[in-house]
Amino acid sequence: MALAGPLFAPATLAADVVDIGFVDQAALSNVRSFTDANRQLAGYKADLDRQFAARMRSVHDQSTQQRIAQEFQNKLAARQRELFGPLFARAQVAIASVASSKNLSVIVDKRIVIVGGQDVTSNVIALLSGPGDPIPPLNTPPPSSVGFVDQAQIDQVPKLKSANDDFQKFQASQQQAAQVKIKGAKTDADRQAVLKDYQAALADKNKQEIAPLVDKTRDAIADVAKKKRLLLVIDRSNLIYGGTDITSDVTNALK
C-alpha cells in the first residue's frame, strides 16, 4: 500500500523546520571507494556468469536449475555484502559526524526535498574521501521534530494485509480473464476495449477497498504526529539519519 511523498506536513513546514539536512546519495555513489567496489562486483559477477553458464549446460531438470540459480545468486549477494557492508557503515558514520557538527537532528534523501534543508553532501564526501576513517559523534541524535514510519510494518497490520492480498488476487484473476479476451479479440479496437475494461475494474476495486485504508493510514499518521508535536513524517526509506520512529504508534492506531 504505497504512500508517496511526505506522509504528514503542515503548510508552515518550511518556516518551522530548521534542523534538517539532506544528502544526494547518487553523488555518494561516485566516491572512489564505491566506484572501486562496483567495479570489483561487476568483475566478480562476470566470472560467476561464466561459471553459471558452464554448470547449466549439462542440467535439464527444472528443480536442479533453480537450485543452481539460487546458489549463484547467494554467492553474488554475499560478495556484495562483503564489498559494500563496510562502505555503508563508514558512510553512516560520516553522515552522523556531519549532522552532529552542524547541529542537524535529521538527514534525509535529497529526492524528497522540494525547498529548504541544508545540503551536506559535499561535507560527507569530504570525510569519505579522506585518508582516515570518519570519527563517530559522541552524542546520539537529539530529539527531532521529524518522524518516520516503516511502511513495510504498517502493511502487515491484519486488515491492511488482508485488503492488499485480496486486491492482488483480484488483479491476477482480472488479468487472466483479460488475456483470454485479448486472444479472442479480432481487431485492435477490441483489444483496446478489453484493456480499458481491465484498467477500469482495477481502478474501481482500488477506490472501493484500498483508497479508504490509505486515507485511514494517513489520518492515523497525522493524529500521532500532532500528539507528538512532529512537523513532518516521512517513510523510513527516505530517512538517512536521526528522526523519531512512530511506526508502532501508527500500527496500534490502525488495529
Feature locations, PLM:
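Bacterial N-terminal signal peptides
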Residues: 1-6
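N-terminal signal peptide c-region/cleavage motif recognized by signal peptidases
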Residues: 9-10
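Amphipathic, charged alpha-helical segments and their helix-to-coil junctions
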Residues: 13-255
